[in-house]
Amino acid sequence: MRSPSELWFRLKQEIGNAASFLHAPALAAGFTEIPQAAILPDPDSFLALLSGSDYAANIELLAGMICGHRFPLLGSVVETGLEIRWRRDFARGIESSLKYFRRISYLDSARAGDHKFIWELNRHQHLIVLAQAFRLTRRREYVDEIQVQLESWWEQNPWLRGINWASALEVAFRALSWIWVDHLAGRALNSGIRRRLLLELYRHGVYLERNLSVYFAPNTHLLGEAVALHALGSLYPELPRSAVWRRAAAGVVQEQMERQVRDDGSHFEQSSYYHVYALDLFLFHALLNPGVSVVFRGKMRRMAQYLSALTSQDGAMPFLGDDDGGNLFHPYGDRRRFGGATLASCCAFFDTGEWRYDARDVAVQAAWWMGPGAFTKKPREPGPDAAPCLFANAGVAVLSNGPVHIVADTRGFGHAGAGHSHAHALSVVCRKADAGIFADILIDPGTFTYTGDPAWRSRFRGTAFHNTVRVDGLDQAEDGGPFRWLNKPETIIVNWTSGLEFAHLSAICCYRGITHERQFLWIAEKGLLAIVDVVRGSMGDSHPHLVEQFWHCGGEAVAASPGVWRIGESATVTMPVSALVEVFSGGEYGWVSNAPGQKEASPVIVVRRTGVLPATLAVVFALGEESVADIAVEASEGTPRIVMGPARSITFGAGAPAIEWI
C-alpha cells in the first residue's frame, strides 16, 4: 500500500515529466560554451606514468574494437555493424519503439529484448575508453568516433522517448560517461558537438532531478542517480539549477550512506558485487564533495575493510548475491577482480597502504580519479594470514584469509524485498592457493540473467544453486518476482569464536517451520574445514522430509575412495560412506555463470537424506596436508559429533567445539 506522501511524490513526478515531454528543456539562446570545473585531475599530469604499460596497450586494443563497432559487453562481444541501433537487443533481434518512456515495457523481454544488454551499451562507458585512447595516443580517429556515436545516439533517442529513458539509473550512468568524455576530450570536440553535449548533460540533470528513485528503487539505483546529479551540479556550476542539484543530491547521498551501509561496512543489498558499486559511488561523490562528514568517511573506510576481507590474496572476490557484470568506471577485464581497482582508489583517497591490490590496478581507476598521487601509494605487502573476522551486521564471516580463503554467509538476504540477494543463507565459498596460484574449491555459481529467462533467474538465485541445505525442494524464501523475495527466513548467529589456529561459526536459519543449524569449524594447522548441519522440524512434525546438501565445486569432482571425493587437484571432501550422494554437471543444478547471459556445466555434489526430522549431515574438507579417509556422524542428545578415526573427533556443543586429535 502506497503512502499519501509517495502518491503525491509520484503525481508531481509524472505531471512534471509530461510537461517536460511537451517542452523539452533548453538552454538560453545566449548561453555560451562553458568549461568543466577544474575538479577532476588533469590527465597530462599522469599520462607519462601509463605510457608503455599493459593498461595503455589494452585501452588501445579496446578502442580499436569499439571503432569497429565490436563492443565488449558483459563478457561477450556485440557486433552492431556499421549503424548502431541504440534500442536494439542484437542477440535477439528485437528493437523497441520510440514511445513515451513510461509506456516502454522494458521488463518484457519478448517485446523489448533483454534490457540489461541494451542498457549496458547505452551507458556509453565505451566512449570513455575512446577518450582515454585519444589522450594516450593523440589519434584524432578516436574523437571522430565519439562524435559520430553521440550524434547517432541523440538522433535515435529523442527526449523522453524509448527504452533508454526508462531507467533513471541508466540516465545517470550515461551522464557520468559524458562527463568523463567532456573532461578528457571536450576541447577536441567540434564546437557544435560540445554545445549539444552540454545541452544533453543539462537535460540528463533535469531528468534525474525529477525522477530520482526515492520510492521505486531506494538502493544503489537512488544512490547512483544522486551521485550523477551532484556531479553535474558540481562540474557545471553555470548550468541552470546546478546549485539546487548539488545541494539536494548531496543530501540524498548522505542519507543513503546512513541507510544503505551498515555499521560493519557491509552494503545492505547483501551482494558483494553491488558492494563494489556502492563503494565506488560513495568514493566518487567524496572526491567531488570534500565536505562529506567524518562519519561518512568512516563508513567508507569500513566498506573498504569489508571488501578487502572478501577478497582472496590474488584479488578475486566471490559473487555473493547478484552480479550484473558492470562497473561504475571501467567494466572491462576479469569481473572477479573489479574490487582491486576500488581498493587501490580507497588507498589513494585515504592515503594508506592498508589494503591489498595489484599495483596495476591503480591505472584502471585511481589514476583518472585522483591523479599522479595515486601512483605513490603502495598496496599492503604479502604477509602473515589475516585473522579470521566476523561482520556481524552482514552475517558474513571470513574463517580463513591466507593461502586458503573461506567465506561463510549466514544471512543471505538483504534489506526489504532483497532484490539482489540470493537464497543462500548459511552458505560457504572457498579458494586455495598452491605454489601461489589460487583455484576455486567451493563456488557461488553466479547470476546468469535478470529478466532474460525467468526460469533460469529463479534457479540461479535459488537455494539449490548454493553451498547450503534445501528442505523438501523449496527455497529458503518465496520467489516474489525477479527482484523480490517474500517471507524471508530469520537468521541468527549463535556463536563466533576465533583465534590463530581455528575459527568456529554457528548460525541458525528458520523458515516454513524448519530450523536449519549449521556449524563451521576451520582448523588452520590441519587445513580442515568441518561442516555439520542439523535440520529440525516443528513440534509434533512426524512427516518424512527430503534434506539436500549442495556442494558446487570449482574443479572436477571425482570419487577417490568410498565416501571421499577429490575436488580439482588439491582438495578432498569426506562424508559418511552411508550417505546417498550424486555427483553431476549440468542437468538441473550443475551450472556456473561467469558473465551475464552465459552459463556452462559445472560439477555439483548433492547429498540427500529422506526421513523424519531431526536430520544430521556432516562433511570434512581437507585443504592442507592432512587427509581424512572416512568419517562417521553421531548425534547423541542433539550434540553432533564427527568421528574421523581412533582418537580423532570433533564434538559440536554449545560454544566452541571440542577437538580430539592424537
Question: Which residues does each predicted region cover?
Answer:
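Boundary detector for helix-to-coil junctions that initiate low-complexity/charged tails
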Residues: 1-11
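Extended, charge-enriched "interface" segments that sit outside catalytic cores
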Residues: 16-109, 116-121
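Short, flexible loop/turn elements at secondary-structure junctions
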Residues: 90, 401-403, 412, 469, ...
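Extracellular structured ligand-interaction cores
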Residues: 116, 121-123, 394-396, 423-427, ...
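CBM-like, beta-strand-rich accessory domains located in the C-terminal region of large
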Residues: 172, 323-324, 331-334, 348-360, ...
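Catalytic Cys-His active-site segments of thiol-dependent hydrolases/isopeptidases
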Residues: 442-446
